[in-house]
């Protein structure tokens, strides 16, 4: 039996080598790009003695887009160790993944997208104690669309209260550094030559960690850009009492509508960098308020960023 296993293993390695040879031949023509399946490693770099910290990548699958009405059906968190100065990721911990029964049928389009069915989640719940242990060791929580994930997570899991968050989709300058889209699957394909089965929380978490370690042409790491952004306070700008006919201008400028939940203003708002705010003030004055200053601006740090921005 051992000899047969060895024979089969050797055959598989030979087939794999043949496929790599074919892939290399195709790529050498310059007319083809070959995507390879992403297999998550447990380690990206060895430490060099520099200080390290722990971050946590999270992703949720939900019954819809509204954090008030919809529910989480899958949660995953993957911790990893990193060097805060260089942005190098060292070891990656095991994923903690949980399905949860939302107490209502999962919409058919969500099941088609995620593969998660009512039968899979029936009677299941997120282990809050396990999540609490996972979150306790992390100084930074990362999601690829934190404006979506954080409101769901904050409502469901008390362990995330007052944690610092960063958004790898918004806070890494993908377009400025030559990438036209911020979608996770596109980024992994375009930048790393890899594909994965997306729209399951654990796969998305591991794919994001891999993406954050792919250097840009200037040698900088996406994760270092993300860390620098997370450390820098931002402005949350509220276009209070903006005229109704200005809504399309504000939407084009990437403002979002707040319906007044949780004591927040009922107004259009946007979170932006300190540098962006300097030019935004002039635009608001001229385009929205007819030469006057009618907006409100608040400084926000990583603990307050993406709260209820779903």
Question: What is the meaning of each model-derived region?
Answer:
Residues 3-163, 170, 177-198, 291-294:
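Conserved non-catalytic scaffold segment of RNase H-like nuclease domains
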Residues 124, 201, 263:
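Residue-level "edge-of-site" marker
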Residues 98, 175, 237-240:
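Residue-level marker of alpha-helix boundaries and capping positions
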Residues 130, 207-208, 269:
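Short Asp/Glu-rich motifs
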Residues 156, 174, 190, 211-218:
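Active-site catalytic microenvironments for nucleophilic, acid-base chemistry
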Residues 203-211:
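Acidic, divalent-metal-coordinating active-site segment for phosphoryl/phosphodiester hydrolysis
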């Amino acid at each position: 039996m051992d000899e047969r296993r060895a024979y089969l293993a050797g055959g598989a390695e030979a087939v794999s080598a043949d496929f790599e040879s074919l892939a290399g031949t195709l790529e050498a023509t310059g007319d083809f790009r070959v995507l390879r399946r992403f297999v998550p490693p447990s380690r990206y770099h060895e430490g060099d003695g520099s200080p390290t910290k722990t971050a946590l990548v999270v992703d949720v699958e939900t019954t819809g887009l509204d954090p008030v009405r919809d529910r989480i059906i899958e949660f995953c968190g993957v911790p990893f160790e990193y060097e805060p100065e260089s942005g190098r990721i060292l070891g990656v911990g095991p994923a903690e993944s949980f399905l949860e029964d939302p107490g209502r049928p999962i919409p058919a389009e969500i099941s088609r997208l995620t593969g998660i069915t009512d039968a899979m989640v029936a009677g299941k719940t997120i282990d809050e104690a396990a999540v609490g242990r996972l979150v306790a060791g992390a100084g930074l929580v990362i999601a690829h669309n934190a404006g979506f994930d954080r409101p769901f997570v904050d409502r469901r899991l008390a362990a995330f209260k007052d944690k610092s968050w960063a958004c790898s989709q918004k806070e890494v300058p993908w377009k400025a550094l030559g990438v036209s889209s911020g979608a996770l699957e596109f980024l992994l394909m375009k930048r790393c030559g890899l594909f994965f089965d997306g729209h399951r929380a654990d796969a998305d978490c591991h794919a994001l960690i891999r993406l954050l370690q792919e250097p840009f042409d200037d040698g900088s790491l996406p994760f270092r850009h993300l860390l620098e952004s997370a450390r820098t306070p931002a402005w949350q700008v509220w276009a209070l009492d903006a005229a109704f006919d200005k809504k399309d201008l504000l939407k084009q400028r990437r403002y979002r509508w707040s319906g007044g939940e949780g004591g927040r203003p009922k107004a259009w708002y946007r979170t932006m960098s300190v540098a962006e705010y300097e030019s935004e003030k002039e635009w608001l004055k001229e385009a929205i308020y007819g030469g006057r200053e009618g907006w409100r601006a608040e400084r926000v740090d990583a603990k307050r960023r993406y709260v209820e921005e779903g």
